[in-house]
Design a protein with these regions (language model features):
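Single, function-defining residue in the core of a domain
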Residues: 1-13, 108, 147-480
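Generic alpha-helix structural propensity
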Residues: 24, 36-40, 53-57, 67, ...
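Glycine/proline-rich, flexible active-site/cofactor-binding loop segments
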Residues: 40, 47-53, 139-143, 152-158, ...
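Structural motif
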Residues: 16-24, 123-129, 386-398
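Short alpha-helix boundary/capping elements
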Residues: 33-38, 49-52, 66, 104, ...
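Contiguous, well-ordered alpha-helical segments that form the cores/surfaces of helical PPI scaffolds
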Residues: 26-32, 137, 401, 405
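Gly/serine-rich nucleotide phosphate-binding loop at the start of the catalytic core
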Residues: 1-63, 69
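Active-site-proximal, Lys/Arg-enriched surface segment
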Residues: 64-159
């Protein structure tokens, strides 16, 4: 599997102007996969057996201006879309977006702030101090198994001043700059869809069922004026929509602007309006009752497709901006949203992609407080640069960890039979014929620690061995 991994990594060579930067990128990706503990950059140095004297150089790689991570992500997004994407019946790529919060109590780490977590999981504290990332992934797979390959991530909470330091453009809603968690997610989806240059459907949870999400997606159009980004999201419980305005009008006063107001939650009591439908939800074929309505939604002044679903005693409402999509497909696509939660688990616990420790003494804000925009005017240029470099390093670390996770998922889909033949360790159950990311990681680790010399003719072997060789001054120091 190291040979196949090396082939995929070598496709990134063209986006690095310097060979040294590319080599450290390979070290970073392979380090995430083969290391046996999650202690930041030092884990990769230790388990790859790279010279300890290169530790500072490895750290500098993440902060380096030579690391053009936007270019790397664009190549990564194109690579994934060309190899293993899942498409809708109309040929659209399926994107999934969500937020991920990680506890970080470092006093000198940029972007750390007090965050609220809503979860029924008793292991999650209601309040933490840390980072909130917005992450967008692409649904890939086949009939056997599906993955959500992460494509892009950036800090989404407490990021107003930091985005200025990083020289990132703020999102706009109807021509007005507006930076919130919702608009940043909408802007990230728009950026990814624009790079893919193909029709996309983004699946989001109810937190993003607000006007700015749909308004930002609406602005991305192709050369012929067709929309390139549609949104599917779960509606809030109190959602209200309107019927079409009556064409005929007679009487006194101003003509009505909207039709009859409908509180959609009340429609669940009208059982006779619902029709039975078979849909695939979480891998199981189920019969649910569905009511599909195209109604006007005031926040965007346009029609949306509302799909009301009764699954036994459970009820929920889905919203879709694509009025041509069938209700069963809308339900099926929303059911795949949980795949990004599985990716978060792999990114956090298997890859250790959030175990970074980048900080700077230029960040002196009280713990849990965001950097305000008005503070930038009194800040030294050197402090601004140090904070921006630290933030870029954090996002680069998470981004490279995402690429490592995605590469494992791609290998699982493309080389499933070979991986299962190489995996000789006992497992109580196999979820499908397609191996998990952890199984692929175990196979690569075994090859690396026991049979790495078999790959001595590959570029990945030469890069790692070059980082292991001791230079003359180091040999003299050991001799002394």
């Amino acid at each position: 599997m190291i040979g196949q991994l090396g082939t995929l990594l070598m496709t990134f060579r063209e986006v690095f102007p310097r060979d040294a930067t590319f080599q450290w990128f390979v070290v970073a990706v392979l380090g995430f996969i083969v290391r046996l503990d999650h202690h930041g950059v030092s884990s990769s140095i230790r388990w790859l057996r790279i010279r300890p004297s290169t530790y500072e150089t490895f750290l500098a790689f993440f902060r380096s201006s030579a690391l053009k991570f936007d270019t790397i992500l664009r190549h990564w997004q194109t690579l994934v879309s060309q190899r293993c994407t899942t498409r809708t019946s109309s040929g659209s790529i399926v994107l999934i977006g969500d937020g991920l919060k990680v506890a970080k109590e470092a006093a000198c780490m940029p972007g750390v702030k007090r965050l609220h977590q809503e979860s029924e999981n008793s292991g999650k504290a209601p309040w933490i101090v840390g980072h909130h990332f917005g992450i967008v992934g692409m649904l890939v797979g086949n009939k056997e198994k599906a993955f959500c390959i992460p494509l892009a991530a950036e800090l989404h909470e407490g990021a107003v001043a930091l985005r200025q330091l990083q020289q990132k453009q703020p999102p706009t809603v109807v021509g007005v700059e507006k930076i919130t968690v919702v608009t940043l997610m909408g802007n990230l989806l728009k950026t990814v869809a624009k790079q893919l240059a193909e029709p996309c459907v983004a699946v989001l949870d109810a937190y993003f069922a607000v006007g700015p999400t749909f308004l930002i997606a609406k602005t991305l159009c192709g050369r012929e004026g067709q929309r390139l980004l549609h949104i599917i999201t779960r509606a809030k419980d109190n959602v209200v929509a309107y019927e079409a305005r009556p064409v005929a009008y007679s009487g006194r006063g101003r003509p009505r602007k909207y039709g009859r107001k409908i509180r959609l939650e009340t429609l669940f009591s009208r059982a006779e309006d619902f029709a039975p439908m078979q849909v695939c939800i979480y891998g199981e074929l189920k019969t649910v009752s569905v009511l599909c309505l195209d109604l006007l939604w005031r926040p965007i002044q346009e029609n949306l497709r509302f799909v009301l679903v009764k699954d036994g005693t459970a009820t929920f409402i889905l919203m879709c901006s694509d009025l041509t999509m069938a209700p069963e497909e809308i339900i099926k696509l929303y059911a795949t949203r949980f795949k990004i939660e599985v990716t978060f688990k792999m990114l956090k616990h298997i890859i250790g992609g959030l175990r970074y420790h980048f900080w700077t003494t230029a960040w002196r804000d009280p713990k849990g407080k965001s950097l305000a925009v008005d503070q930038l005017s009194d800040m030294l240029d050197r402090s601004k640069r140090l904070i921006a470099d630290a933030m870029n390093a954090i996002e680069a670390f998470v981004g490279i960890a995402m690429i490592a996770t995605g590469l494992l998922q791609m290998l699982a889909l493309e080389h499933a039979e070979k991986i299962r033949s190489l995996h000789r360790w006992w497992m109580r159950t196999y979820s499908s014929e397609i191996p998990s990311e952890e199984m692929v990681k175990t196979v690569i680790q075994h090859e690396f620690y026991h049979n790495f010399r078999r790959f001595k003719h590959t570029a990945i072997y030469r890069i790692i061995q070059a980082k292991r060789r001791q230079q003359a001054p180091e040999l003299m120091e050991m001799a002394a």
